[in-house]
């Protein structure tokens, strides 16, 4: 399996989690875990995909955990994070050399391409510019939702990804969570009859991501 196929299926192995009150204190250690069923499409790689993480906060740590737990599939080789303790923590976890530690995402792209992919887990308003720059340099991208703040920016990303023949995999990870897999299965089987209306909300408490 090559790196493109991994990026296409990577989100099957990743998931966000609803954090209960008794786990909130452990967020900094990122000790909670969300397990999804093994993806049958995931095949062994010839070598691990190398990636640079932009943003080493909560979501950057989640993808970092995947790399730590699946070293044959993903290796983190660089990080951009402006908060010093997060930068140092992430670098130490993944044994990132000093030359590949950056304070800003802009600094990453001052270097020639030195990894297969970029993981963009920056704040929502900082998705568009790093994504466009990464595409220009030939990186494949794992992009946290939302893609970008405006429709036009989303269209710009799509157009450049097609032009450069690069992957932009958007992290709608809950699509593959056991909760939604089971819901789809029950509806498809007709277990609750014919579905004529759906009201959906995210079942999280008020402290979620506060």
Show which residues each predicted segment covers:
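Short, Asp-centered acidic motifs that coordinate Mg2+ and/or phosphate
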Residues: 78, 117, 197
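Hydrophobic residues in well-ordered beta-strands that form the structural core
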Residues: 53, 120, 143, 149, ...
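Short, well-ordered coil/turn segments that N-cap beta-strands
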Residues: 74, 116, 139, 166-167, ...
């Amino acid at each position: 399996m090559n790196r493109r196929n991994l990026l296409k299926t990577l989100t099957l192995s990743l998931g966000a989690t609803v954090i209960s009150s008794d786990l909130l204190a452990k967020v900094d250690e990122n000790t909670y875990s969300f397990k999804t069923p093994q993806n049958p499409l995931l095949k062994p790689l010839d070598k691990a995909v190398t990636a640079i993480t932009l943003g080493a906060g909560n979501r950057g740590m989640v993808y970092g955990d995947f790399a730590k737990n699946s070293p044959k599939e993903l290796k983190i080789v660089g990080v951009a994070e402006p908060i010093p303790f997060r930068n140092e923590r992430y670098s130490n976890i993944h044994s990132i050399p000093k030359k590949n530690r950056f304070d800003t995402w802009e600094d990453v792209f001052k270097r020639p391409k030195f990894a297969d992919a970029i993981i963009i887990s920056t704040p929502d308003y900082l998705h568009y510019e790093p994504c466009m720059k990464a595409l220009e340099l030939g990186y494949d991208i794992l992009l946290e939702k939302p893609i970008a703040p405006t429709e036009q920016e989303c269209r710009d990303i799509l157009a450049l990804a097609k032009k450069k023949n690069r992957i932009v995999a958007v992290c709608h990870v809950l699509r593959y969570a056991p909760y939604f897999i089971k819901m789809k299965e029950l509806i498809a089987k007709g277990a609750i009859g014919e579905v004529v209306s759906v009201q959906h909300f995210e079942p999280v408490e008020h402290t979620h991501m506060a």
